[in-house]
Every structure is written in structure tokens, then in C-alpha cells.
């Protein structure tokens, strides 16, 4: 990902948080993580994150999804003696379509990214609007997509070890690489 794309995404995130009435400090805005998952199409498969804290006991983040942007299917595996990350998603703004293991929805509201259909395998649908939340157990495959306006989701979890996430799509690279051009 180019530095200009990161800056544009960060600026969009800042505007989304302003519209949602969620304050971020200048320091937090400078540290927005923009993940295109190495797939090169941030608008379709990507995620923007602000990590408030991540210790060996707990983690708190904000996840920002642009309209119809999808975080690819993945799970949080056991690491050492830890059973894997347990996380609660609480929608703060917009709408998010969350898909987990379980009985598939008769009609899925989100759109699986074209060309990636083979890598989306769970379709138990949870739709979150502001104030609603859902807890994802450790080791559970899941993926999520922003609604028509996008979404801001607060994540409360056990320790986050994103570098160990297992994605269904083997092309995904979880840790973003940014090439600054200035």
C-alpha cells in the first residue's frame, strides 16, 4: 500500500469518527492502522483500526469499515497456553454484517467480494446497529462487512495477537506494509 492511500484512508476514518461523535486524539489519528491484507483493494477487502490498549490481559480497539468494505474470513487460534482471542463487537455507528460459524442465513445481506467466494465459508448472520453487540468465542471463523454508510465497531477482547490470525484466503497478509512515497 502506498503512503498516499494510507493518508487518504486515515482522513476518511477521521471524518467517520467526527460524524459518529467519537473523539480521537491527534496521536491516535497518526497511528490509525490501515490494513489492505496484501490484497491491493482496500475499498473492497480492508479494515482500519485504532488500538487504545493491548496488554497481556486485555485489548480495546475501534474498527472502522468503509461502505461495503469487508474484513476477510479468519479465526484467532490458540497461542501457547492461551485459547485464542475472545472478542466482543459493539456497533457504535452505521451497520455491520457479521458472519460466524453456525446455521447459515437463508439470504445473506452482505456481498462476498467478487473472486473471493471460495474463501468465505461461514454465513450465520448477525446484523449489528448502534448499541448492539455480539461476542465471538476463541477459534471461531468469522468475517464482517460495513453497511451502506460504513460502520464503527468497538472491540473489547482478550490479548490481540493479530500476527497469528489464520485467514481462509492464503493470499492474505495480516500485517500491513506501507511504502511512503514522500
From Swiss-Prot:
UniProt keyword annotations, A-Z: Carbohydrate metabolism, Isomerase, Manganese, Metal-binding
Enzyme Commission number(s) of this protein: 5.3.1.15
Molecular function GO terms recorded: D-lyxose ketol-isomerase activity; manganese ion binding
Claim: Flavoprotein is one of the keywords in the record: no
Any one GO biological process: carbohydrate metabolic process
UniProt key word Manganese: yes
InterPro entries (alphabetical): D-lyxose_isomer, RmlC-like_jellyroll, RmlC_Cupin_sf
Annotated thermal dependence: Optimum temperature is 70 degrees Celsius.
Subunit structure, as described in the record: Homodimer.
Protein name: D-lyxose ketol-isomerase
Organism of derivation: Cohnella laeviribosi
Amino acid at each position: 500500500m502506498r503512503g498516499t492511500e494510507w493518508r487518504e484512508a486515515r482522513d476518511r476514518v477521521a471524518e467517520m469518527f467526527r460524524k459518529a461523535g467519537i473523539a480521537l486524539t491527534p496521536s491516535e489519528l497518526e497511528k490509525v492502522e490501515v490494513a489492505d491484507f496484501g490484497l491491493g483493494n482496500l475499498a473492497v477487502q480492508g479494515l482500519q483500526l485504532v488500538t487504545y490498549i493491548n496488554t497481556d490481559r486485555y485489548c480495546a480497539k475501534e474498527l472502522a469499515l468503509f461502505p461495503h468494505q469487508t474484513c476477510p474470513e479468519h479465526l484467532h487460534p490458540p497461542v501457547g497456553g492461551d485459547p485464542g482471542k475472545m472478542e466482543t463487537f459493539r456497533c457504535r455507528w452505521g451497520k455491520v454484517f457479521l458472519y460466524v460459524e453456525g446455521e447459515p442465513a437463508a439470504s445473506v445481506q452482505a456481498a462476498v467480494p467478487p473472486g473471493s467466494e471460495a474463501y468465505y465459508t461461514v454465513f450465520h448472520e448477525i446484523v449489528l446497529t448502534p448499541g448492539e453487540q455480539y461476542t465471538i468465542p476463541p477459534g471461531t471463523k468469522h468475517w464482517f462487512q460495513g453497511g451502506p454508510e460504513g460502520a464503527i465497531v468497538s472491540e473489547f477482547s482478550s490479548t490481540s495477537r493479530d500476527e497469528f490470525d489464520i485467514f481462509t484466503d492464503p493470499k492474505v497478509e495480516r500485517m500491513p506494509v506501507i511504502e511512503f512515497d514522500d
